[in-house]
Amino acid sequence: MTPLCPRPALCYHFLTSLLRSAMQNARGARQRAEAAVLSGPGPPLGRAAQHGIPRPLSSAGRLSQGCRGASTVGAAGWKGELPKAGGSPAPGPETPAISPSKRARPAEVGGMQLRFARLSEHATAPTRGSARAAGYDLYSAYDYTIPPMEKAVVKTDIQIALPSGCYGRVAPRSGLAAKHFIDVGAGVIDEDYRGNVGVVLFNFGKEKFEVKKGDRIAQLICERIFYPEIEEVQALDDTERGSGGFGSTGKN
């Protein structure tokens, strides 16, 4: 019987070398496949999954897309994108702007307006006769009759809030004084007074004077005032005039 290999020892070494080379080639192919999976997009769950190799994140682009998707779904209303490395934080949800007119404000104290409120339907708003008139005309809310050499408190049925730092001076109207001898008394309205404005009218004429509802009876002038502190001293500085009083500066 003729043997298959005339030299068995040589055949054994040849087959062993061939098998070792095949195993090395297979191992190298597997390593190259694993490296390709780690660096490339990677196959779907196939050979890599079968060998227990976890599928890696595909790329930075897909990572950013996933983050943006999560921010859209998980934080509805978030405006802006995720911050870049080394950049400032991304802005939070936008807050609607609040109009200055709707913000809480402290209560106004005074101001440059002369404010008024009507206390009845008989009241008339103060008016000025011209753009540069010094006073605001005040109107009677009711009918009155003032006998000669008598007086009456004429109600206007308005209350006023004077400009800050002012008091109200109630002055007579020139027409009533010149034609009917009607004068005004007690004509000071304090800045903090909030009652019904009443005007004291004096009739210095010889006939009774009729006041009708809606008649102009006086004028209100807003004048600046200073509120000094009171200080008591032992003696005051002397002046050239001294205590000279009535008529001390001349006869006419």
UniProtKB/Swiss-Prot annotation:
Record-listed dUTP binding positions: R173, S174, G175, G187, V188, I189, D190, E191, D192, Y193, G198, R241, F246, G247
Reaction(s) catalysed by this chain's protein: dUTP + H2O = dUMP + diphosphate + H(+)
Pfam families tied to this protein: dUTPase
Natural source organism: Homo sapiens
InterPro entries assigned to the protein according to its UniProt record, in alphabetical order: dUTPase (IPR008181), dUTPase-like (IPR029054), dUTPase-like_sf (IPR036157), dUTPase_trimeric (IPR033704)
GO molecular function per UniProt: dUTP diphosphatase activity; identical protein binding; magnesium ion binding; peroxisome proliferator activated receptor binding; pyrimidine deoxyribonucleotide binding; RNA binding; signaling receptor inhibitor activity
Tissue: Found in a variety of tissues. Isoform 3 expression is constitutive, while isoform 2 expression correlates with the onset of DNA replication (at protein level). Isoform 2 degradation coincides with the cessation of nuclear DNA replication (at protein level).
Protein name as catalogued: Deoxyuridine 5'-triphosphate nucleotidohydrolase, mitochondrial
Disulfide bonds: none
Quaternary structure and interacting proteins, as annotated: Homotrimer.
Regulation: Phosphorylation is necessary for activity.
Region of interest: Disordered: 78-104
Gene name as annotated: DUT
Consequence of substituting Y227C: In BMFDMS; uncertain significance
Linked pathology: Bone marrow failure and diabetes mellitus syndrome: A form of bone marrow failure syndrome, a heterogeneous group of life-threatening disorders characterized by hematopoietic defects in association with a range of variable extra-hematopoietic manifestations. BMFDMS is an autosomal recessive form characterized by various degrees of bone marrow failure, ranging from dyserythropoiesis to bone marrow aplasia, with onset in infancy or early childhood, and non-autoimmune insulin-dependent diabetes mellitus appearing in the first or second decades.
Domain of life: Eukaryota
PTM description: Phosphorylation in mature T-cells occurs in a cell cycle-dependent manner. Isoform 3 is not phosphorylated.
Protein purpose: Catalyzes the cleavage of 2'-deoxyuridine 5'-triphosphate (dUTP) into 2'-deoxyuridine 5'-monophosphate (dUMP) and inorganic pyrophosphate and through its action efficiently prevents uracil misincorporation into DNA and at the same time provides dUMP, the substrate for de novo thymidylate biosynthesis. Inhibits peroxisome proliferator-activated receptor (PPAR) activity by binding of its N-terminal to PPAR, preventing the latter's dimerization with retinoid X receptor. Essential for embryonic development.
